[in-house]
Regions:
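Catalytic cores of RNA-modifying enzymes
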Residues: 1-222, 228, 245-253
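Extended, hydrophobic beta-loop-alpha segments that form or line the acyl/peptidyl-thioester binding
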Residues: 220, 232-235
């Protein structure tokens, strides 16, 4: 199977499986090899690493991750993409695809099973409609994470870096800056995706620095300028609330 990081190979796979994009899942697949390589390089992946990929799509970035890491766990919510992933990733024996909602996946259990409980690295082209719950959940849950390298809406990436007292400072800014050192590693125009999103994107990297999930974070929140309102009213740029996932809680009954 050829690498998918270009329009030609991506279109061939989509046509082969007669795949239709679903807007409800915020699907925009990367088709630029340069951006893919920048993301992989920024993640600092080694052959000792376990990678959690959220939303692998057709496996474009997953292929690159499999080439670089010891183990890749790819969590995909869209059932229609599973047979495609089985095809595009068939040459790799170091990848496991899980068909589930990432907010309901027990990441601690995965880290324990596939990485002996050691910290993992998260790499993802995140669906923009659910960016905040995923990021907040990753940082605020007791998930063993070494670093995150993710693609997000540019406006959201910019918000992660603003300081207290600015109008865009909110719960996401506070959490990211408390738990990691945020850095934008690439600004990505819409033409690097298929289909093209209506907004610009940025690849964001952050090495996790804080490990105290309790009193220290509460104290930091209370002392931050404007934190009381920030924690209760996150910006709605990505179209979601600031509720984070539990990453291991029981699924709600149907």
């Amino acid at each position: 199977m050829a690498f998918l990081g270009n329009p030609k190979n991506t279109i061939e796979v989509l046509q082969k499986y007669n795949f239709n994009f679903q807007k409800k899942f915020g699907q925009n697949f990367l088709i630029d090899t340069n951006i893919l390589e920048e993301i992989i390089d920024s993640a600092g992946i080694t052959k000792d690493d376990m990678i959690l990929e959220i939303g692998p799509g057709i496996g474009t970035m997953t292929q690159y991750l499999c080439e670089s890491a010891r183990q890749v766990i790819a969590v995909e919510i869209d059932t229609n993409l599973i047979p495609i992933l089985e095809d595009t990733l068939s040459e790799y024996d170091n990848v496991k695809v899980i068909n589930d909602d990432i907010l309901k996946v027990d990441i601690n259990a995965l880290a324990e099973e596939y990485n002996n409980g050691k910290p993992i690295k998260v790499v993802a082209n995140l669906p923009y409609y659910i960016t905040t719950p995923i990021i907040m959940g990753l940082f605020e849950s007791h998930v063993p994470i070494d670093s995150i390298t993710i693609m997000v809406q540019k406006e959201v990436a910019d918000r992660m870096q603003v300081g207290p007292g600015t109008k865009d400072y909110g719960a996401l800014s506070l959490a990211v800056q408390y738990y990691a050192k945020p850095e934008i590693v690439a600004n990505v125009p819409p033409n690097c995706f298929m289909p093209r999103p209506n907004v610009g994107s940025s690849a964001f990297a952050g090495e996790k620095t804080a490990t105290d999930y309790g009193a220290a974070y509460t104290s930091y929140s209370a002392g931050a300028s404007g934190s009381a309102s920030a924690l209760g009213s996150e910006s709605k740029t990505d179209g979601v609330t600031n509720e984070s996932g539990d990453f291991g809680g029981q699924p709600e009954p149907d």
